[in-house]
């Protein structure tokens, strides 16, 4: 497994679609995320009670994350998606030493 250097956390609310609709779309687009250069892993998130969804992305580098942020996939799947509101996209450097101790 590649070393995680950067983590991206994305959250949004659903509008105009149900959780089940979202799950269907997520299953369809997941293979597109699996092909992203520099993406080590993505955890898909769901908090149905608070209508909050999103993902935690584990990147090899901040540059790989920035390439995704400027991609057509990001624009279509997230930024310009009318069914996703209150989009939050935050990035974090990984603290290597303590993260290794805790098995990242």
Model-derived segments and spans:
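Conserved RNP beta-strands of RNA recognition motif
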Residues: 55-59
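A common structural junction motif
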Residues: 75-79
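Short S/T/G/P-rich N-terminal loop/turn motif that feeds into the first structured element of a domain
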Residues: 1-52, 62-70, 83-104
């Amino acid at each position: 497994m590649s070393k995680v250097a950067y983590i991206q956390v994305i959250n949004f609310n659903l509008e105009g679609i149900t959780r089940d609709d979202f799950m269907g779309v997520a299953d369809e687009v997941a293979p597109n995320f699996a092909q992203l250069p520099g993406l080590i892993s993505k955890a898909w998130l769901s908090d149905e009670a608070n209508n909050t969804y999103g993902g935690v992305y584990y990147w090899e580098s901040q540059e790989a994350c920035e390439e995704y942020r400027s991609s057509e996939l990001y624009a279509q799947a997230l930024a310009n998606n009318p069914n996703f509101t209150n989009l939050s996209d935050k990035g974090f450097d990984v603290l290597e030493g303590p993260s290794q101790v805790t098995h990242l």
